[in-house]
């Protein structure tokens, strides 16, 4: 049997397409209706895609390569623009420059810098080594770090700024009396205030050891831990001020309180001072169990420390470390011992009794008065830290303070071990930027006390990660009035700020008031507070109505007032 296979049903048939032959040119002979009246301009595939206008044929600033992007097909006028005067669409445009908000200023600054920056392997650029690794030279690394900080400051990039906490919680029953902003306080001036007149002097001072003037980076000396008691007694707890208030003066304070008020325009952190008005007399006090006596670190820096409290580089822990260093340094540089000579004032230390056998720090108290005009007489307790014997035999009283270096990389500062011996001015200038408020308060205290010299010590950590061991790298001395001029500190302005606050309180009724620096704004506020406020702060547990009392983080000594 045979089968016939029909292959015609399995394969499709081929139909010849109709080909149009255009004798006059190329392309189709007939144009569909959908493409009629559509302008056409010849183009080249080499032309840039997405260009809106053809600028290359009209003007070109680069004469050497004026035909660099030119095309023979881009000269048509199908898409040319012809201006027609149509006044119906005419309207005015506001050409005033719009002020950008602060968070948008400098957004594209780094983009502009990257366009004009140097290329790879060029001078100041990147150095490329094998295996695809890119490194920076040591000089370029140091030069790049400040630029990073500037980008964060001016471009507002990175995390938002950390809000500081107030030194005391403002309560609902406090009445705000006055707000004083810094621009207004800076303009105040009270000239022609004479040097204070001594009322009485107390305490005992030890003599300065001149061998510490020869210390340098190559001949450093370890900082010792000296177990001595330092009294930080407030105004109303001072028995001498209580005695003097009966006959002399109508405004009473300590040098630390006065320096805080006088240098308030340089402060960034929050602080508070309690003021009591009794009749025509004013008493300025600091609250107990607070951080008023702690020394701030990098308070006025562009990037102040913001670590957590658990870190040794947190603002509070750095302040405790700086206070610990300052107390120990001021006692170590003195000639100690029973056989060494001492300078004794008229009266003994008013804060210890004769039967107490304790080691007290070398401090001399000078009670002085100033006449501020309008029957205002200020009485304050000032302090000296040491005394220096001159060749003529006359003693020179010293105010001894210490600057501390904690981590130059984190603090955006200069390394003391590299710059202190050769460029001490650069180190001091950097400290004036980072610790302007602290240095100003030290200077004011030295001027008020009448110190002949202000001794500054440079103390650094042995290891940046170890906050318990330090070394002395050098010392420097200044005359207080000359140093005040050098750091642009005006005593006339300082007296003006103090007089302004005194006048405000004098106008109020008798009672208790509180002056506080706003933690995040350059403003000082004066509050009228109830008379029983902060009375519970004197309890034995050290806790007041503001919560937990002041406690030391590091156990530098057994007593909170010891060093």
Swiss-Prot record:
Residues 98-167 are annotated as: Disordered. GO terms for molecular function: mRNA cap binding; translation initiation factor activity. Keywords: Cytoplasm, Initiation factor, Phosphoprotein, Protein biosynthesis, RNA-binding. Residues 291-305 are annotated as: RNA gate. Belongs to the eIF-3 subunit D family. The RNA gate region regulates mRNA cap recognition to prevent promiscuous mRNA-binding before assembly of eif3d into the full eukaryotic translation initiation factor 3 (eIF-3) complex. Component of the eukaryotic translation initiation factor 3 (eIF-3) complex. The eIF-3 complex interacts with pix. This is Eukaryotic translation initiation factor 3 subunit D-1. The lineage of its organism: Eukaryota, Metazoa, Ecdysozoa, Arthropoda, Hexapoda.
């Amino acid at each position: 049997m045979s089968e016939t296979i029909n292959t015609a049903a399995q394969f499709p048939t081929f139909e010849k397409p109709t080909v149009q032959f255009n004798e006059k040119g190329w392309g189709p002979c007939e144009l569909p209706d959908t493409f009629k009246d559509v302008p056409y301009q010849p183009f080249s595939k080499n032309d840039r895609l997405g260009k809106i206008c053809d600028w290359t044929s009209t003007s070109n600033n680069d004469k050497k390569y004026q035909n660099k992007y030119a095309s023979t097909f881009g000269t048509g006028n199908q898409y040319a623009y012809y201006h027609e005067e149509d006044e119906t669409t005419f309207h005015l445009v506001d050409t005033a420059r719009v002020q950008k908000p602060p968070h948008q200023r400098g957004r594209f600054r780094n983009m502009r810098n990257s366009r004009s920056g140097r290329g790879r392997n060029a001078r100041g650029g990147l150095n490329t080594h094998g295996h695809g690794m890119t490194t920076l030279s040591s000089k370029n690394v140091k030069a790049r770090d400040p630029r990073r900080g500037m980008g964060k400051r001016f471009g507002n990039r990175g995390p938002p700024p950390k809000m500081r906490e107030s030194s005391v919680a403002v309560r609902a029953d406090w009445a705000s009396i006055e707000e004083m902003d810094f621009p207004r306080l800076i303009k105040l001036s009270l000239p022609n205030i004479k040097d204070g007149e001594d009322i009485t002097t107390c305490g005992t001072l030890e003599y300065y050891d001149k061998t510490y003037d020869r210390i340098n980076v190559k001949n450093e000396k370890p900082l010792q831990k000296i177990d001595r008691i330092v009294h930080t007694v407030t105004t109303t707890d001072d028995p001498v001020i209580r005695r003097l208030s009966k006959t002399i003066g109508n405004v009473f304070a300590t040098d630390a309180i006065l320096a805080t008020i006088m240098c308030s325009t340089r402060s960034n952190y929050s602080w508070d001072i309690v003021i009591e008005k009794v009749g025509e007399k004013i008493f300025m006090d600091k609250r107990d169990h607070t951080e008023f006596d702690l020394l701030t670190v990098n308070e006025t820096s562009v990037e102040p420390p913001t670590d957590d409290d658990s870190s040794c580089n947190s603002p509070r822990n750095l302040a405790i470390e700086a206070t610990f260093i300052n107390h120990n340094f001021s006692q170590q540089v003195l000639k100690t011992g029973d056989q060494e000579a001492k300078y004794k004032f008229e009266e003994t230390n008013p804060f210890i009794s004769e039967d107490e056998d304790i080691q007290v720090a070398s401090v001399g108290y000078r009670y002085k008065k100033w006449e501020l005009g309008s029957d205002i007489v200020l009485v304050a307790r000032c302090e000296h830290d040491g005394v220096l014997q001159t060749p003529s035999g006359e003693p020179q009283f010293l105010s001894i303070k210490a600057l501390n270096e904690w981590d130059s990389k984190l603090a955006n500062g200069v390394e003391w071990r590299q710059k202190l011996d050769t460029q001490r001015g650069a180190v001091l200038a950097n400290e004036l930027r980072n610790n302007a408020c602290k240095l100003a308060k030290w200077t004011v205290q030295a001027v008020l006390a009448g110190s002949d010299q202000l001794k500054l010590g440079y103390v650094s950590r042995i290891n940046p990660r170890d906050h318990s061991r330090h070394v002395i790298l050098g010392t420097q001395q200044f005359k207080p009035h000359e140093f005040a001029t050098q750091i642009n500190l005006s005593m006339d302005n300082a007296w003006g700020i103090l007089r302004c606050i005194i006048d405000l309180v004098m106008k109020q009724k008798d009672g208790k008031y509180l002056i506080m620096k706003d933690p995040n704004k350059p403003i000082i506020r004066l509050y009228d507070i109830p008379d029983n406020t902060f009375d519970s702060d004197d309890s034995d547990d050290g806790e007041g109505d503001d919560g937990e009392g002041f406690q030391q983080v590091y156990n530098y000594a057994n007593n909170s007032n010891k060093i």
